[in-house]
């Protein structure tokens, strides 16, 4: 194809993404490493709105770089997020570091976060979710589940109800070993 000079700024938009954009109705959905989902008019390139992955926070990082999936019927974008920064040192970012190392669902119609599921709280091990989310209708024992699936660096398969972010199966969290780093809380 040819560059459309009337789209955005002489044929391009600034989105800082490494994830392929998705077409949604008359819009282009871009997942930005600046920690947001941005929606642009597909004809003009004008930004219609953006939804931030993180509100107020005490950390950096958590960028959605691993991939995204769009459920056009439900008008929901699912993303996976990176770990908080600095990656291996969390003294200056206490707490869970919400929405990092997570699967996050964005409601494009309501323009907000629908739900988030955090795989690793206060990630100190670079265990962010690096594989794109997969949307799949899965039949288990005769019952159909609308799921979003993500594979993790720890070898886990996260299987969630894509409507509410609840796990399909029971899961068990484990406490991390106590850190040897002064003032670090695991």
Regions found by a protein language model. Give the residues of each.
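Beta-propeller blade signature
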Residues: 1, 36-45, 96-111, 157-165
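Mobile, glycine-rich extracellular loop/lid and propeptide segments
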Residues: 1-6, 10-42, 51, 159-160
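Aromatic (tryptophan-biased) beta-strands that constitute blades/sheets of beta-rich domains
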Residues: 2-14, 46-57, 112-121, 166-186
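Short, solvent-exposed loop/turn and secondary-structure capping segments
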Residues: 8, 41-43, 50-52, 80-82, ...
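Acidic, glycine-rich active-site loops and adjacent beta-strand->loop/helix elements
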Residues: 54-55, 83-84, 120-121, 152-155
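Extended hydrophobic/aromatic segments used for targeting, binding, or gating
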Residues: 100-107, 112-116, 120-125, 133, ...
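Phosphate/diphosphate-binding loops
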Residues: 132-183
